[in-house]
């Protein structure tokens, strides 16, 4: 009896230790893969060769489209997606901007863009790392910068020649790392469709070919997740920063018909105008442009429409001029015979959600606490 009693006690202790060990075993981190198809218009999913994207949407949730933040440019909108802040609030208000307090000019390719003072808010990779997770970036605006002293655990400097297939392959390589080294948040950026759209147009066969390449790359990542047995813990979020609107050469506003371009600093052209008078006389420039063309709305910085949420930041150009959808604004000297351009005032990506809301939907997928943002969930 004594031996049997001891055996029972010993067995109970073993079971208790096993239960405690199971309770203490850490659950594997969920994985969030944020994918951007730059320039992917709201209707491309239904009319271009994208079977992997359509299959992914059928298994999950899909919005009809997304309303980009103003301005509908690559850097402002991509950073809005990961911070949940409007461009005027996170500070990256355009692809080209100036800041007197920094004493520099920001452009997408300049070394000055790597100064963390340009980048406000807390992007998702910083949030993930603050929670003890690892993050990886296969290109994304801001990931080459030490924001709040943090870069992604793994990141690749932007290089356009790196193909879509190689970008997808790098993502699968990161996912193949051992559990303790594997990133649980990954961004990957594809620009092939955007380039084809600008160069050839929204109905060109080159655009269809680019879409097929991107969809194949998405399929490559999905297959990699499946092969690694990570299906149940991986969430894909596919986004775009803006759409495309066809233009004709008879819908071009030449602002140098009204203003000498040598007297202004032209920060943005085509989709909208961002202008700073070199002599500092904002009122004079405003009077020269306002009401001069029926398809061009002209505003001072603090008078832009409230719906644009594009006020209150000194990096915003003193004069903002927005063409109607389907129009472009440029100069006679700089006109480029492009078949289309992204919209600005009424962008051709329209539907029930905005990129500021994505941050609130992405954070729970990381099991991370929320941070302050401009977004809301419907």
Question: Over which residues does each language-model region extend?
Answer:
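Active-site neighborhoods of enzymes that stabilize oxyanions during catalysis
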Residues: 267-378
């Amino acid at each position: 009896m004594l031996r049997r009693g001891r055996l029972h006690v010993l067995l109970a202790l073993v079971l208790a230790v096993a239960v405690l060990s199971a309770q203490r075993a850490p659950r594997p981190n969920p994985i969030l893969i944020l994918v951007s198809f730059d320039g992917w218009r709201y209707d491309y999913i239904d009319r271009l060769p994208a079977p992997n994207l359509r299959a992914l949407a059928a298994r999950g949730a899909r919005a009809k489209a997304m309303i980009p933040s103003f301005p509908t440019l690559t850097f402002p909108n991509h950073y809005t997606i990961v911070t949940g802040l409007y461009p005027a609030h996170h500070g990256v208000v355009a692809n080209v901007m100036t800041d007197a307090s920094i004493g520099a000019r920001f452009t997408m390719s300049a070394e000055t863009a790597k100064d963390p003072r340009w980048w406000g808010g807390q992007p998702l990779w910083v949030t993930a790392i603050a929670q003890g997770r690892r993050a990886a970036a296969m290109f994304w605006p801001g990931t080459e910068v030490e924001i709040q002293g943090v870069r992604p655990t793994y990141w690749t400097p932007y290089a356009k020649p790196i193909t879509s297939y190689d970008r997808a392959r790098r993502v699968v390589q990161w996912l193949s790392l051992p559990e303790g080294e594997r990133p649980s948040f990954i961004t990957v950026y594809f620009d092939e469709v955007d380039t084809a759209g600008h160069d050839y147009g929204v109905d060109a066969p080159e655009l269809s070919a680019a879409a097929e390449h991107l969809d194949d790359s998405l399929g490559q990542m999905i297959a990699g997740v499946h092969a690694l047995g990570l299906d149940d813990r991986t969430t894909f979020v596919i986004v775009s920063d803006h759409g495309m609107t066809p233009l004709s050469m008879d819908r071009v506003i030449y602002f140098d018909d009204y203003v000498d371009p040598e007297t202004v600093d032209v920060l943005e052209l085509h989709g909208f105008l961002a202008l700073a008078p070199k002599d500092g006389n904002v009122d004079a420039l405003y009077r020269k442009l306002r009401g001069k063309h029926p398809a061009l709305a002209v505003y001072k910085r603090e008078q832009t429409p409230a719906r644009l949420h594009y006020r209150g930041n000194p990096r915003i150009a003193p004069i903002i001029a927005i063409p109607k959808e389907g129009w472009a604004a440029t100069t006679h000297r700089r006109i480029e015979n492009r078949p289309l351009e992204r919209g600005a005032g009424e962008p051709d990506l329209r539907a029930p959600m905005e990129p500021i809301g994505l941050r609130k939907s992405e954070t729970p997928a990381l099991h991370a606490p929320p941070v302050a943002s401009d977004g809301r969930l419907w």
